[in-house]
Amino acid sequence: MSDRPEADRVTGTPHPRDCPRLIGHAAAEAEILASFDEGRLHHAWLLTGPQGIGKATLAWRLARFLIATPPQDGSSLFGEPVPLTSLDIPDDHPVARRMIAGAEPGLCSITRPFDEKAKRLKAQITVEELRRLSGFFGLSAADGGRRVVIIDSADEMNASAANALLKMLEEPPRNAILLLISHQPARLLPTIRSRCRTLRLGTLGPADMATAVTAAGGQVDPASAAALSELAQGSVGAALRLLSQDGLGIYAELVALLATSPQLDRQRALALANSCAGRQNEARLDLVLQLLDVALARLARAGALGRAPEVQAAAGESTMISRLAPNAQSGRDWAARAQVIGDRAR
């Protein structure tokens, strides 16, 4: 594969095509299989839920399954239905091998393209990317099989691309299955949403989170697994980012800094700011701001609810929150501060 950044891949983690195992979403797979077994698989699926929870992994698993599995005629040698119970396809299956190599003719993946002049990914999926599908669907599917399209993410389409997709959904090609990944489905045209079958994936609990992170190549300290799950909010992608950029350490430092309020330890704050200075530390600055927003949101929520979160995301967090957000008014104050800081950071 190329060293170029991929729009559908979290930096430092395996691409979804390289993750044949899906963790924590058995119910979603069961819903798809039930539809498949009953012979009423919808031609377009909208996979929704927070970013990084496994939607793309499910899409690639489903694509692998659909291309590798011949259309069912609804009967076996003895005439009874033959229900399938898993989307698993062996790693040595020709389709699995071709997908890993990026050479499966029955699959087309649509993502934000790479801008050769700017040497970075474009900000949107353009109509030119959708036009590629005309040629893709114009080819005959091998052995009369299916053709699968993955759009990751559909939220990133510009208006022209969205309209081109809508026309395709209104008149779907024969044996075509479209898999749309969406982190924010409200951003999609209502007419696109209405022509898809929506399947929402939930966030992962601590145990599934640790298993999924380990499967993706990360290492989770059992002592910090609960804190990692709390900060990642059930997203494997977010958890991997936190692990690769010392997110737990950064959050612990933010908690310690907030604990010095209202005076605030200015030397400590300056040291944290200096650690984010320079273009080489842009990723760290982005994470610090994101985690500060999380900390302020937890303060605001605790004030509104009248109690600290059940799970501490850092040592001393419960004590800090109980002192700084003891009531509903303090919760509203922290929410207002979060809004001001967020506006200034943009």
Predicted regions located by residue number:
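Flexible beta-alpha connector loops of hexameric P-loop NTPases
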Residues: 117-127, 154, 198
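Conserved D-loop-proximal element of ABC-family nucleotide-binding domains
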Residues: 159-160, 190
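Charged, glycine-rich active-site and insertion segments that engage polyanionic ligands
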Residues: 1-65, 69-77, 81, 85-88, ...
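Conserved catalytic/switch belt of AAA+ P-loop NTPases
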Residues: 138, 163-177
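A short hydrophobic beta-strand->loop->alpha-helix junction that borders the nucleotide-binding pocket
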Residues: 48, 109-114
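Loop/turn-to-beta-strand initiation segments
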Residues: 143-148, 173-179
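Conserved alpha-helical scaffold flanking the Walker A/P-loop in AAA+ ATPase domains
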Residues: 31-36, 93, 124-146, 156, ...
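Conserved Walker B
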Residues: 153-157, 169, 185
